[in-house]
């Protein structure tokens, strides 16, 4: 992904950066991995260990840090919806843009995200401007509630230059491509 913040040529094990499909039709089919964890995953999943290979995700923030498996560019594939059709098909909701804050537990199960801006959706139309919009939930339920993703015309690459992980803490650039998407029954908070 040429414009992604998590883009690199080779990871810190010398493995070329590559596309790894993680989820297909709601099921995990691949994982970010290193040379070591690829073999461990193959054994755990009952896959052919001889076929196991690193996904090229072993990175360190500096020469004086041990490489760890890190997020690279993780993207949601574009869907088939136009933005106008997505809004028109939504009776009641909030359209949120631009990530502002995040909090997620170590197991990546419980999360809360805040956004810069939001718009009320009523009767299939964008309405008044909202500030300090947040959404919170549990990861499996959240992703299972996605029922629409906009098309490639609306797909953009976003990212963060300060994704922290590890002990001692390592900061890395990570990217994610996405188009506007709709999630049902998500707990939200807004200031009007």
Regions found by a protein language model. Give the residues of each.
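N-terminal small-residue-enriched
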Residues: 1-192
């Amino acid at each position: 992904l040429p414009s992604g913040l998590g883009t690199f040529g080779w990871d810190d094990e010398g493995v070329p950066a590559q596309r790894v499909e993680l989820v297909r039709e709601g099921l995990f089919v691949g994982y970010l991995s290193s040379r070591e964890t690829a073999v461990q995953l193959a054994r755990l999943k009952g896959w052919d260990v001889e076929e196991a290979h690193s996904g090229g995700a072993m990175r360190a923030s500096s020469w004086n840090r041990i490489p760890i498996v890190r997020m690279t560019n993780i993207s949601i594939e574009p869907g088939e919806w136009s933005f106008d059709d997505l809004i028109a098909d939504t009776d009641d909701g909030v359209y949120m843009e631009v990530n502002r804050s995040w909090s997620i537990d170590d197991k990546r199960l419980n999360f809360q995200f805040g956004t810069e801006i939001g718009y009320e959706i009523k009767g299939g139309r964008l309405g008044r401007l909202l500030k300090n919009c947040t959404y919170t939930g549990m990861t499996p339920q959240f992703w299972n509630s996605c029922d629409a993703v906009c098309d490639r015309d609306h797909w953009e690459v976003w990212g963060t230059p300060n994704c922290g992980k590890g002990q001692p803490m390592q900061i890395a650039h990570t990217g994610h491509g996405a188009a506007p998407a709709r999630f049902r029954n998500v707990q939200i908070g807004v200031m009007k």
